[in-house]
Amino acid sequence: MFLAALDGTIVATAMPTIVGELHGIDHYAWVFSAYLLAEIATIPLWGKFADMYGRKRIFLAGMTIFLIGSVLCGQAHSMNELILFRAFQGLGAGCILPVAQTISADLFTLEQRVKVQGIYAAVFGFASIIGPLIGGFLTDNLSWRWVFYVNIPVGIAAAVLVKVVMIEPLQDRHRHRIDWLGIVTLLGWTCLLVFALETGGRDYAWSSPTIVGSLAGSVILLAAFIVAELRSAEPLLPLGLFKIPALRASAVLSTLLGMTMFGVLSFLPLFVQVVIGTSATSAGRVLTPLMLGFMVASAFGGRLLLRVGFRVQVALGMALSLPGLFLLTQLDVGSSTLEISRDLVFVGLGFGLVLLACTLAAQNSVSLRQMGTATGIVNFTRQLGGAVGVAIAASVMLTSLTHRLAEAFPGANINASEFLSPASSGQKVPPAAQEAVRHAFSGALHQVFVTAAVMGALGLLCVLLMPRGKPGALRDEAHGHEPAIDAVAPDAEVFVAAESEAEAGESEAGEYEPGKGEPGEVEPARAG
């Protein structure tokens, strides 16, 4: 659990140094997107394999792939290599959290799991806070490569504990139909979409055959994905659940917040290090208030939801986050890290409340047997939104940065990556040009923050889609049986980090238990 949360936050603070050393700012977004897309596509596979071949064996296999990917990332000597290795690392990352949650469901009773969730909350919160700090410290004092190597001792320790200590309970092994067509079409349409969004208007004209073909191919593969999911006996994404208004609203809001959240998290360290001129360690400290905001929202969000209901909590969360997003658009070369930390407190509090409400609204709108599936849909859409959001933010920033650097250095062939390498920036950029470079990056990243604020505003408009009811009411209305959300809501406070908030609710009431229910309906919960 610690490793999953740590890996989700540790890389961002090292990215300015990485792209500076590897000279690949044009591929900035793909370091995040490749990891997310690989993780999204493989989580359902790992979940099914765990049912078919045993939790321990599959967990160790996934951890091995993740650790090999971490070593390869640390050995990368070009951006293309790093992107490829990040995708490989994402294949293993898709196993760690969901299979660990399933192991928890196997080992503990429902009553015990309620207590265990408190431990998970503490672990996720702690890892999410120290992740950026560790990433910055390692980058400044050792090398950016250590943000990947640090996974190795933690991962080995976890694998040894599982291997030696865990006694896997006897259980029926379930055969599953793997939705290979769904996986292939999902990867196809998302990769083509991310490619078009990231390179359109910058590397290729929007009207060019490359971009038009990519977008057309994405639409065709999306249609194929929908058809595949409708026909599959065990789909990655059970589309029938989108007929439920509360779940549909939660998915839309989760997508928009994923786009906003990942856009801010991925590019804010770049602003702190390049524009303000601080170290990677300072950039890590700047992100800490965002994670603290998530923790506070997690601690009180469940109780608040019981009092005010879904729509009011979402509206309150957006009302908190939008001022923070707006203040981020006001940052410039004269801003301080204290100002950014202040802004991120509001963003973290707001996002924490909204994401918690989305997850519980989705869970509360379905039967207990489908609760894990609903949780997975919300998490799936958030991560998918994150991959798309990072691509959009990168396109906006790089397009603006190219124009601004061209204006600042007319006639010069400027490589923006030169300004990001601590070892070379002072030699290659004359002191007189440093201010122009800072202003160019500031203006470009301003466009990123404006884009994030617009996405957040769209989320506010979607508040009306969210049901008014309080926990328990939606399931009563939809299914006419006793609500179980009251047992879930207080412990849903474990949604404390950008990479983990939806999975935490899954193990509480939606985990698949061998021999019970219908595996095909529950497994897709691991698609997030």
Question: For the regions a protein language model found, what residue spans apply to each?
Answer:
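Central mid-sequence intracellular linker of multi-pass
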Residues: V154-C191, L241-K243, F409-S417
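A membrane-interface helix-boundary motif in multi-pass transporters
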Residues: D140-I152, T199-T210, S279, T399-A453
